[in-house]
Design a protein with these regions (language model features):
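Electron-transfer interface patches adjacent to heme c in soluble/periplasmic c-type cytochromes
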Residues: 1-156, 160-177, 182-279
């Protein structure tokens, strides 16, 4: 694995990993390619959409052929944080970890604040030696000493310090974006509220049918519904929706226009896309 992703693992006589140097940055950091493709200044918080975590996991010699097929099906930029617990396969697009300072609940399904998800991933996915408990999911993991919980506050503070990146110069049509801003206020701001871009800060969740997205992943979670996703730096991280089912922002706008019967013309949809690119 060191040759593939730059992390090292130690295994025992049964080929079980006993130590692995995996961190949040594996999935939530990339580089600006300023030296050459794949080499440059680090960009923490940016989703690593080149990472094929499933293919890496599938290299394990102790996995069954059936499980290897599941892991290999995910593709680059996706990960299923529940497959090892419930055996169901609905991988998610790796989300950004920037712009979270004003966001109440992390994750697509808003099961808890950022430290909740950090603990979940550290303990249930990364093999961290710590505690995680969620009776809603039937998870109760205790480890002594707890080496995860004491680190959560500092990790949260660092993540809260990561701003959403502004759009590159000349990456959108400013006049169209201005028209799109008016359309956004009329058609989208009920759910994408104020500066945070989400109504979940007030506790709101949405059934999959409300947005036309697949509900299989939400059904596996504690809330059984989706959070309105914040919109800052949308330009940076296609594809969209939790499962990557929308390749472009134009696809996103077209889907909501259809599902919510908003009635935008083709020109209005283009203007709205330019506004979203400006965020």
């Amino acid at each position: 694995m060191n040759a593939i992703v730059g992390i090292q693992a130690t295994v025992d006589a049964n080929n079980h990993i006993t130590r692995l140097g995996v961190t949040c940055a594996l999935c939530h950091s990339t580089v600006d390619n300023s030296v050459m493709p794949g080499i440059g200044r680090r960009r923490d918080g940016w989703p690593n959409r080149d990472l094929n975590a499933g293919a890496i996991i599938a290299l394990s010699p102790v996995l069954s052929a059936e499980k290897k097929a599941v892991y290999n099906s995910w593709g680059p930029g996706k990960y299923d944080p529940r497959f090892n617990l419930d055996g169901k396969n609905t991988p998610l697009v790796i989300p950004p970890a920037y712009g979270l300072a004003e966001i109440k609940n992390e994750t697509y399904t808003a099961e808890g604040p950022i430290s909740y998800w950090n603990a979940y991933v550290a303990v249930t996915q990364m093999g961290g030696q710590g505690n995680f408990s969620d009776p809603r999911l039937g998870i109760e993991i205790q480890h002594s000493p707890d080496m995860v919980t004491p680190k959560l506050a500092a990790l949260r503070a660092y993540q809260h310090s990561l701003p959403a990146p502004p759009p590159p110069a000349s990456s959108f049509d400013a006049a169209a974006a201005e028209r799109g801003s008016t359309l956004f206020d009329q058609a989208c701001s009920t759910c994408h509220v104020a500066a945070t871009g989400t109504d979940n800060n007030s506790g709101k969740l949405h059934a999959a049918a409300d947005t036309g997205v697949d509900g299989a992943y939400a059904a596996r979670t504690a809330n059984k519904a989706y959070r309105t996703t914040p919109l800052r730096a949308l330009w940076q991280h296609p594809p969209y929706f939790h499962d990557g089912s929308a390749a472009t922002l134009a696809d996103v706008v077209a889907q909501y226009n259809r599902v919510r019967a908003i009635g935008l013309t083709a020109e209005q949809q283009r203007d709205l896309v330019e506004y979203l690119k400006s965020l």
